[in-house]
Amino acid sequence: MQHHFHFHLHHHAPRRARYDVDMTQGSTTRHLINFALPLLAGNLFQQLYNMVDTWVVGNFVSNEAFSAVGTVTPIINTLIGFFLGMSSGAGVVISQYYGAHRPEKVHEAVHTAMLLTIVMGVVFTGVGIAMTPLMLELMKTPAEVAPDQTVYLTIYFAGIMGLLLYNMGSGILRAVGDSRRPFYFLLVSAGVNTALDLLFVLKFGMGVEGVAYATIIAQAVSAVLTIAVLVRYDGSVKLSLRKLRIHWDMLKKIVAVGIPAALQMAITAFSNVFVQGYINHFGADCMSGWTAYTKIDQLVILPVQSLSLASTTFVGQNLGVGNVERAKGGVRQALYLSVAVTAVLLVPVLLLAPDL
């Protein structure tokens, strides 16, 4: 499904903020790579602090705790995947208006997206906590793992607002070409998470509960940093908390792009709940092996995900300014780069598979 928005291109280009990147001019390949690299680094750190969670509980708590933390990913990703689809819709709309030099429309889209995030955060907290017993039942969770999973998920969903605000805020920054500062914030968040993991588990003996609290505190830190930057932003995506409201025409545009992506990501994640259910039949040891595999799989796919996000911003800005051919060229170049990177990464994974 294609969504075409009509923009008036006679507006003068506004002064760009320091970290903004205009992708409507210059080398397509250079823009994609320069934009994707901070995204890749940020995603690696995000995976790193997820791995730290599982490493800490696996080494200092128990094998059951390792399985519990590592195998709740499909449940979390079902809700997070839906939200990420919606936030991608906001990013597409913002990048198109930004490319078309419509700062007043960018302003409306930013404030609509952030208020939508707050509403979804409240809903996800309630739905996530309420769904946890049902999802664990669908996953056929072994009795020895279920208590730890319930504790982890309840705390995680209670603090999910931070994750949503960070993801929407960083998506807004990426829409105007700024992929560096979201990376810096993830770097800080990863450091906070690692320190708190070790403090809560080793010093206070909090086990899975400590790891969950460390995660939501770290996510809250990244959210505060992102919102602070948007509030102080010298550009069209400047956020004013007093101006938060739903602009209904803008919401329709965001939903039109976001819902298909949201459903795709949520359904894919939800299907993994049943896959995890089959794995869980074999007990905690098999669950631990599956957890280790999924971590490797996630690392390999990160470069392609980063290029995908880079191409979203590139295409959005160029469609906004009316340069359809350049947008198509960006998609082709992103596909070429993705195939090349995947081919390179497949070699060590296949060769080292027995040892991994």
Residue ranges and their predicted role:
Residues 2, 10-34, 215, 226-268:
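Interhelical loop/hinge segments that connect adjacent transmembrane helices in multipass membrane
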Residues 30-91, 95, 259-279:
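Signature of the first transmembrane helix
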Residues 36, 43, 70-73, 117, ...:
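Residue-level recognition of transmembrane alpha-helices
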Residues 44, 48-66, 136-143, 199-206, ...:
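Helix-terminus/linker motif at the lipid-water interface of multi-pass membrane proteins
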Residues 66-126, 163-182, 290-353:
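Small-residue-rich hydrophobic transmembrane alpha-helices
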Residues 123-154, 344-356:
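Short membrane-interface helical motifs at transmembrane helix boundaries
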Residues 128, 171, 197, 201, ...:
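Structural signal for membrane-spanning alpha-helices in multi-pass inner-membrane proteins
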Residues 190-224, 228, 355:
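Membrane-interface helix-loop junctions in multi-pass transport and translocation proteins
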